[in-house]
Curated annotation (Swiss-Prot):
The keyword Isomerase does not apply. Its cofactor is Mn(2+). Expressed in heart, brain, lung, kidney and testis and, to a lesser extent, in liver and skeletal muscle. No expression in spleen. Its EC number is 2.4.1.149. The gene is B3GNT2. Interacts with B3GNT8; this interaction greatly increases B3GNT2 catalytic activity, independently of B3GNT8 enzymatic activity. It is a single-pass type II membrane protein. Disruption phenotype: Strongly reduced number polylactosamine structures on N-glycans in immunological tissues. B-cells and T-cells proliferate show hyperproliferation. Mice also display defective accessory olfactory bulb innervation. Impaired sexual behaviour. While female mice are fertile, males show a reduced rate of reproduction. Defects cannot be attributed to any physical defect in their reproductive organs, suggesting that the phenotype observed may result from an impaired sexual response to female mating partners. It comes from Mus musculus. This is N-acetyllactosaminide beta-1,3-N-acetylglucosaminyltransferase 2. Residues 29-325 are lumenal.
Length: 397
C-alpha cells in the first residue's frame, strides 16, 4: 500500500473518531440541561397526586379514614403527611359503648331524628351475643340456607313460612334448612313481653337465631353482619343462601331448579335479586328511608332490594370479611351493596325477583307465580294458599 493511500485511510479514521467524540459530548450536554426545559424530561414541581379532600358528611368522612387504613399505599401517604397517625376506631370488633364523640363530630346532631341519634351513638358496636342459637342447624351440609329477617311479634308470619315456602326438606343429597333472624324488642319500643311464647316456639321448631341488640329498622345492617358472622362460624359449608323478609312469598322449587342449572363458575360469585342502580339517599324527613346530608352524600352502589336476594355460600364468607371494612349504614340492602363493591362485585338483576309486586290483575292467577322466585308482599294466609296451589298435581299453566 502506498504512503498516500495510508495517509488518506488514517485521516478517515481520525475524522470518524472526532464525529463519535462530538456526539458523546452533545448527548452529555443535553442530559445535563434543565429537565424541565422544552423537549426535556419533565420533573413535577410538586406531588402529581393528592389524597381526596376530607368529605363533609360524617359517614363519608369516617369511611374515607377506613379506606385509607386498609389501603397500604394510602395508609403510607397518610402517615407521611400526618393525616392518619393511628388505626381507626376498632371498638366495633370487641367492646361496645355509646360513642359520645359523634355529638360534636356530626353537624347539628341534636336536631337529628332520635332514630339517627341512636344509630350514630352505636355505629361502631357489633359485638352482640347470641341469646338463642341453633348450633346443629348445619350439621348436614345445606344446599340452600333460608335466612328470614323477622321480629319477635311476627309469630303468624313465621308459622306461615314454615308451612309453605320455608319448609325444611332433604331431597337426595340436597338439604334445605331454615333460620329466622331476630333481635330484642324492648318495652321502650312499645312491644309486649313475648319471651315465654318465643321460648316455646324456639324449643318446638329449632329455627330461631336471636341476638342481644335492639331490633329496629336502622339496625338491619347490624343484623346482616351478625348473621354473616354466624354463617362463617356455624354454617360455613352452605352452598347457597337466600336471605329475605318475613312478608315475601318465595317459590323455593323454582330457586332450587335455577341453582341446579348453574355452572361452577357462575355459582362461585352468585348474587342475584331485584337490583337498583344509580339511586341516592332520600332527603324528605317524612320518609322511612330519610338520610340527612350531614350523614351521607353521594350515589349508592348497585344493590339488591331488601325484600330478598340469593347468593352463594362462599360469597357469604367473603361478604363477612368485607363488613369489617365498611361502616354500618342505616339501610341494610344499601350496606350489602357497599360490601359487594368492596369485593369488586356487582349484584345481578333477575326478573324473577319482584320486590315491588306483580300487576294487580295477575295476583289471583296462580300461573303468574310459576316463574317467579320472590314476590313482595304477601300476608301469612296468602303465602299458604299460593304454596298449596303451586303444589297441586292438577295445576295446568
Amino acid at each position: 500500500m502506498s504512503v498516500g493511500r495510508r495517509r488518506v485511510k488514517l485521516l478517515g479514521i481520525l475524522m470518524m473518531a472526532n464525529v463519535f467524540i462530538y456526539l458523546i459530548v452533545e448527548v452529555s450536554k443535553n442530559s445535563s440541561q434543565d429537565k424541565n426545559g422544552k423537549g426535556g424530561v419533565i420533573i413535577p414541581k410538586e406531588k402529581f397526586w393528592k389524597p381526596p379532600s376530607t368529605p363533609r358528611a360524617y359517614w363519608n368522612r369516617e369511611q374515607e379514614k377506613l379506606n385509607r387504613w386498609y389501603n397500604p399505599i394510602l395508609n403510607r401517604v397518610a402517615n407521611q403527611t400526618g393525616e392518619l397517625a393511628t388505626s381507626p376506631n376498632t371498638s366495633h370488633l370487641s367492646y361496645c359503648e355509646p360513642d359520645s364523640t359523634v355529638m360534636t363530630a356530626v353537624t347539628d346532631f341534636n336536631n337529628l331524628p332520635d332514630r339517627f341519634k341512636d344509630f350514630l351513638l352505636y355505629l361502631r358496636c357489633r359485638n352482640y351475643s347470641l341469646l338463642i342459637d341453633q348450633p346443629k342447624k348445619c350439621a348436614k351440609k345445606p344446599f340452600l340456607l333460608l335466612a328470614i329477617k323477622s321480629l319477635i311479634p311476627h309469630f303468624a308470619r313465621r308459622q306461615a313460612i314454615r308451612e309453605s315456602w320455608g319448609r325444611e326438606t332433604n331431597v337426595g343429597n340436597q338439604t334445605v334448612v331454615r333460620v329466622f333472624l331476630l333481635g330484642k324488642t324492648p318495652p321502650e319500643d312499645n312491644h309486649p313481653d313475648l319471651s315465654d311464647m318465643l321460648k316455646f316456639e324456639s324449643d318446638k321448631h329449632q329455627d330461631i337465631l336471636m341476638w342481644n341488640y335492639r331490633d329496629t329498622f336502622f339496625n338491619l345492617s347490624l343484623k346482616e353482619v351478625l348473621f354473616l358472622r354466624w354463617v362463617s362460624t356455624s354454617c360455613p359449608d352452605a352452598e347457597f343462601v337466600f336471605k329475605g323478609d318475613d312478608d315475601v312469598f318465595v317459590n323455593t322449587h323454582h330457586i332450587l331448579n335455577y341453582l341446579n342449572s348453574l355452572s361452577k363458575s357462575k355459582a362461585k360469585d352468585l348474587f342475584i335479586g331485584d337490583v337498583i342502580h344509580n339511586a341516592g339517599p332520600h332527603r324528605d324527613k317524612k320518609l322511612k328511608y330519610y338520610i340527612p346530608e350531614v350523614f351521607y352524600t353521594g350515589v349508592y352502589p348497585p344493590y339488591a332490594g331488601g325484600g330478598g336476594f340469593l347468593y352463594s355460600g362462599p360469597l357469604a364468607l367473603r361478604l363477612y370479611s368485607a363488613t369489617s371494612r365498611v361502616h354500618l349504614y342505616p339501610i341494610d340492602d344499601v350496606y350489602t351493596g357497599m360490601c359487594l363493591q368492596k369485593l369488586g362485585l356487582v349484584p345481578e338483576k333477575h326478573k324473577g325477583f319482584r320486590t315491588f309486586d306483580i300487576e294487580e290483575k295477575n295476583k289471583k292467577n296462580i300461573c303468574s307465580y310459576i316463574d317467579l322466585m320472590l314476590v313482595h308482599s304477601r300476608k301469612p294466609q296468602e303465602m299458604i294458599d299460593i304454596w298449596s296451589q303451586l303444589q297441586s298435581p292438577n295445576l295446568k299453566c
